[in-house]
Amino acid sequence: MDYGAVVGGYHSDMTRDGSVGEVDEERKNVYDIVLRAQRAALDFLRPGVACMEADRAARELITREGYGNDYRHGTGHGVGIEIHEQPVLSPASKQVLAPGHVVTVEPGIYLPGRFGVRIEDMAFLTQDAVKI
């Protein structure tokens, strides 16, 4: 489920995964891969880092696990007055992160006709930290 709210003119954006009934081992494994990919990307977020590096961290992990072709979008985007803003965390993005940026980190794996998993959180960059 993709959730969001607008408070004081600013957007939020997050996604959570859920299932009804028994969850098979492949879905549990895919969820774990996506969660680890998100953590890998979050570990790269800091001022001065190119957005493509955070994307690469998530994408390489998913690819190593055999699902590279099933990761069909960028890793994240800026959020603010608009729901989708700059900077963009994608393979080709040369944008550089800076203090004050608010970005989503939302890797996903999508297996058509079966299931998909995406985990999305927002991160606020300060000079010294990333706040989730």
Regions found by a protein language model. Name each.
Residues 1-132:
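Active-site neighborhoods and metal-handling regions in enzymes and metal-associated proteins
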